[in-house]
Amino acid sequence: MSAIPAGLAIRFKRWEGNADLPVPAYATVGAAGFDLRAHVPDDAPIVLKPGARCMAPTGFSVAIPDGYEMQVRPRSGLALKNGVTVVNAPGTVDSDYRGQVCVLLINLGEEDFTIRRGDRIAQGVIAAAPQWPLVEVEDLDATERGAGGFGSTGV
């Protein structure tokens, strides 16, 4: 396990109406990501049609230490079994954002997918995100690759 800087923690604030949902948590000792769950009404699940997108609320806000971000990543099981994934993977939650964390999902499968209250819909991963100095220059140093991209190094 990598060392977490002393005194740092990820703080979650529960939104009203979700006292029954667990705080995001790691499922196993070696898990890199913690589960994010759907905060939708019991009587109003989200039905995600094939090809459709939605914004699923989690019922939590988060405070992330400066210099870090929370990446919102797909759950591999949802992607494999149902074709449901995070549209903007990985989504980024900035350290200064304090609104409700929502997950942008898309159904790439062939059948409707129903998102119910408490379903694990994504995972959060905390990553370093320093703000580097951004400098405009006249020229960039040459590399062997140059401007080659999009398959230029082979398939």
From Swiss-Prot:
Its cofactor is Mg(2+). This enzyme is involved in nucleotide metabolism: it produces dUMP, the immediate precursor of thymidine nucleotides and it decreases the intracellular concentration of dUTP so that uracil cannot be incorporated into DNA. Signal peptide: none annotated. This is Deoxyuridine 5'-triphosphate nucleotidohydrolase. Pathway: Pyrimidine metabolism; dUMP biosynthesis; dUMP from dCTP (dUTP route): step 2/2. Its EC number is 3.6.1.23. SUPFAM superfamilies: dUTPase-like (SSF51283). PANTHER family: DEOXYURIDINE 5'-TRIPHOSPHATE NUCLEOTIDOHYDROLASE. GO terms for biological process: dUMP biosynthetic process; dUTP catabolic process. The keyword Magnesium applies. Belongs to the dUTPase family. GO terms for molecular function: dUTP diphosphatase activity; magnesium ion binding. The lineage of its organism: Bacteria, Pseudomonadati, Pseudomonadota, Alphaproteobacteria, Caulobacterales. InterPro entries: dUTPase, dUTPase-like, dUTPase-like_sf, dUTPase_trimeric. Keywords: Hydrolase, Magnesium, Metal-binding, Nucleotide metabolism. It catalyses: dUTP + H2O = dUMP + diphosphate + H(+). It comes from Caulobacter vibrioides (strain NA1000 / CB15N). Substrate binds at R75, S76, G77, N88, T92, V93, D94.
